[in-house]
Each structure stands twice: as structure tokens, then as C-alpha cells.
Amino acid sequence: MRRVFLAAMLLFTSGLATATECVVLLHGLSRSSLSMNKMERALIEAGYATANIDYPSRDHVIEELAVIAVTAGIAECRAQSATKRIHFVTHSLGGILVRQYLSDYELPELGRVVMLGPPNQGSAAVDALGDVPGFDWINGPAGRQLGKGADSVPLGLGPADFELGVIAGTRTIDPVTSAVLPDPDDGKVSVEDTRLEGMADFVIVPHSHAFMMRMQRVIDLTKAFLATGSFGDADGRD
């Protein structure tokens, strides 16, 4: 039923983008594709084909998840025969999976990438709270790799050599985690730790890590970057 609904939206939409452009959406740790549904609908309305991927974020290390999730998204986009360009919109861990994949594989159709709240420099919360009972059950092996220590995967990856826009949040609904993070933060990642050398644009929004992907301002900024490679004249620059 979901595929029928999305196909109908694609048939009747008349946005600026065309169906030759496909967007892979990757959710964050311990989330599902449902968290990206509002973003997906907006992108379809803008004329993009989409591949909103579910992947088992708590079951594998990042290196394995990157292959599982990104490969699935690329395959779904390529299955839509008109696709000539593949973009990515990611939340949190999803952005690290794209970085990991692109460090190992080439993607000739690669377009632009928008990362929402990515722990590009790791998150101090992992190091501070990693010994709390239940951490591994909630976050799985990939969660352990998102810190700032010797096992950090993000810190072992290189700068962006692709068109990247990063959106960072400054509102928290998680005071416990925020207490161990440098200010400002979104409840999971500090603003400073979302940055990545080589990124094309960067913007700060007053939203939380958990819900930023559902906020209209974030959706509008995402569409702007996918279309132009810039967040435009948006507030929140520093």
C-alpha cells in the first residue's frame, strides 16, 4: 500500500526536480524509516523519486551497516530506470554510513548529501555514558563506534569530497545526555561535532536531535540544498 501511495504522489507531483533524481533517506540509530516519512513525502512532492530505507541499526557494526543500508538505497534508486542522479538525506548515524560507504566505494551517480545532526566528530555522550547498564542493548555495536576514542569510526574517516550540507540542532529534550555534551547541543551531539572538513554549507536550527527531520524549516533547508548546493540565505549561520 505504501508503494502505491508513493507512486501516486510521483505521478501527480510537478515540483522543480524531476524523477531522474532519486533521494536515499537513511534514519538514525534505533529508529526506522517511519521517522523519515514526512521528509520523504516533501521530497516526492518536490519531484524526487525516493528510497526510504529500513536497516537493522542495532545489529551490526558501522562498516557492515554501510554496505547493507547504502547498497539497498542505491539499488532501489537504480531500479527506477529514469534515475541519473542519487542524493542522500540522512539523520544521525545514517550520515556516518554514507561517509563509510563513500570511503570504500565509488558512486558515479552521486549528487548531493544533506546530514541532519550527524556525529561527524563522534559524540562525547558515547564515551560518558557507554558504561551505563543497557547502553549496548539500546545502541548495539554501532553505538559503541560513535564516540571520540580510539574505536571512533567517524574520526577515522576523511573529509567530505562530495557536496555536503550539514544541519545541526540546538534544542534538547534529553537533559541527562546534554549534561555531558559541550554547549550548544541537540541532546545527542554537540553542534561543533556535527561539522566536517570539506562541507559545502552548514546551518544551525533550534530543534532537537530526535525530531529535527520532521520540522518544516529543516525540510525546506534540505530541499534547498538538494536543488542548489546551498542553504541559501537561511538564518543560523555562524
Give names to the regions the model predicted.
Residues T13-S14:
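N-terminal signal peptide c-region/cleavage motif recognized by signal peptidases
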Residues M1-R3:
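Positively charged n-region of N-terminal signal peptides that target proteins for export
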Residues A17-A19:
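Boundary at the C-terminal end of the N-terminal hydrophobic targeting segment
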Residues S103-D238:
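Helical cap/lid subdomain of alpha/beta-hydrolase-fold lipid enzymes
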Residues F5-M9:
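Sec-dependent signal peptide hydrophobic core
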Residues E21-L34, K38, I44-R58, I62-D161:
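Serine-dependent carboxylesterase/thioesterase catalytic core
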